[in-house]
């Protein structure tokens, strides 16, 4: 029987991640990254059956040319595999309130994604370019949109409405939306399996920690609160994003220090977070190296990162009422035993006790419980957003 394969596309502003995923197993048959769009050294790297390959895309390549390369060069060299692709699944960062679940893409869906572009100006326009490129290259395959925000549409209004004049929400949609929903969905499901509990009876707090980072309270398989807001800027300290700050800082920077609003936006999104505090790097590995060497900026950045994360985790016990586990995922969450241990030590009041050997073992793609047997459970689960996108794509096309 042929496999149920899906080509998954994740279009950034100047890059395109892609994978051919088996929707039944989550295994990637092909995976790769095209990057540096718009520059002379645009390149594409991919892996088939563990074999890594790389090629130049040519000067000033963009999404359409990258998709054409995937079709005409990579997939053309794997005709049996290409023939099993049943759909193209697209990761879409922001679906606003228009999209509460994954959908098959048609003209109305494209219009809806366009309408949400103001909420994700760096991401949604790039997703639309990727969708149109995929439609041109795969005119006979169904295209599916999977939204990062959809999982969080189950939040109650007390969690997503800001304490601003209500008409700003009613008339302009200004509210908390949250991100990383596909990742939080996947790891919360996997956590229930590891706990040997029905998903509907499982309460977990998921920490997706990468250059972007967010925490979500998941009650019975549904998001009930999350740290990112209208945009990905709110919440935790991140690689280059400031997370939560006093909003009046913006007024102070503009009116007292002479910043423009564009400069403030750039400062808070690209110059803050771990990079801004440490004055060293946004890469957590570099921060940990600096911490080990006694670098004051790196040490402070690490301490603030862990402290803010622990406070969020503690606060999310409120909407859950009962906590079954804390789940770490994402590049930092999956690989930094140091950060996991620091965060859980700050949460000792909740009876977290780290098992050092288990914690060190749960790295580099290995999942596992990292706490002692008599402790509240904390675990590491590598995320697999592409698998969720592939699963949703197959489910949707089978309903048609």
Curated annotation (Swiss-Prot):
One Pfam family per UniProt:
Acetate_kinase
Cite the cofactor comment: Mg(2+). Can also accept Mn(2+).
Location in the cell: Cytoplasm
Residues reported to bind ATP: 17, 208-212, 283-285, 331-335
CDD domains attached to this UniProt entry:
ASKHA_NBD_AcK_PK (cd24010)
Q: Which domain of life does the UniProt lineage start with?
A: Bacteria
**Binding of Mg(2+): at which residues?**
10, 385
Catalytic activity from the UniProt record: acetate + ATP = acetyl phosphate + ADP
The protein's site described by Transition state stabilizer is found at 180, 241
- Cite the active-site annotation: 148 (proton donor/acceptor)
Main location class: cytoplasm
Q: Binding residues for substrate, per the UniProt record?
A: 91
Single GO MF annotation: ATP binding
**GO annotations of cellular component type:** cytosol
| PANTHER family assigned to the protein according to its UniProt record, in alphabetical order | ACETATE KINASE (PTHR21060:SF21)
> Its biological function?
Catalyzes the formation of acetyl phosphate from acetate and ATP. Can also catalyze the reverse reaction.
Its assembly, as annotated, is: Homodimer.
| Protein name (record) | Acetate kinase
Please name the source species.
Shewanella sp. (strain W3-18-1)
């Amino acid at each position: 029987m042929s496999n149920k394969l899906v080509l998954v596309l994740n279009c950034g502003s100047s890059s395109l991640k892609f994978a051919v995923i088996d929707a039944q197993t989550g295994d990637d048959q092909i995976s790769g990254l095209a990057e540096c769009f718009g520059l002379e050294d645009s390149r594409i790297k991919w892996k088939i059956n563990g074999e890594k390959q790389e090629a130049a895309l040519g000067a000033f390549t963009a999404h359409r040319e990258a998709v054409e390369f995937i079709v005409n060069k990579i997939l053309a060299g794997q005709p049996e595999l290409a023939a099993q692709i049943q759909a193209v699944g697209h990761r879409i960062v922001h679906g606003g309130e228009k999209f509460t679940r994954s959908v098959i893409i048609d003209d109305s869906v494209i219009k809806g994604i366009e309408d949400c572009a103001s909420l994700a100006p760096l991401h949604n326009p790039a997703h639309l370019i990727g969708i149109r490129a995929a439609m041109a290259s795969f005119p006979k395959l169904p295209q599916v949109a999977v939204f990062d925000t959809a999982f969080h549409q189950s939040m109650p209004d007390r969690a997503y409405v800001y304490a601003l004049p209500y008409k700003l929400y009613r008339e302009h949609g200004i509210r908390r939306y949250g991100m990383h929903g596909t990742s939080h969905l996947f790891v919360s499901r996997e956590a229930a399996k590891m706990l040997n509990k029905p998903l509907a009876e499982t309460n977990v707090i998921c920490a997706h920690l990468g250059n972007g980072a967010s925490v979500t309270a998941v009650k019975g398989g549904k998001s009930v609160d999350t740290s990112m807001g209208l945009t990905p800027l709110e919440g935790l300290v991140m690689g280059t994003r400031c997370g939560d700050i006093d909003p009046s800082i913006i007024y102070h920077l503009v009116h007292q220090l002479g910043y423009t609003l564009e400069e403030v936006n750039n400062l808070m999104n690209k110059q803050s977070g771990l990079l801004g505090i440490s004055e060293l790097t946004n890469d957590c590995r570099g921060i940990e190296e600096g911490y080990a060497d006694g670098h004051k900026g790196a040490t402070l950045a690490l301490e603030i990162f862990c402290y803010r994360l622990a406070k969020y985790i503690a606060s999310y016990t409120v909407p859950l009422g009962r906590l079954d586990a804390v789940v770490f995922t994402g590049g930092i969450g999956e690989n930094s035993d140091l950060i996991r241990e620091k965060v859980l030590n700050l949460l000792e009041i909740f009876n977290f006790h780290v098992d050092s050997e288990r914690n060190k073992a749960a790295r580099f793609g290995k999942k596992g419980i990292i706490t002692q047997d008599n402790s509240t459970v904390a675990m590491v689960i590598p995320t697999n957003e592409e698998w969720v996108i592939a699963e949703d794509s197959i489910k949707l096309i089978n309903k048609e």
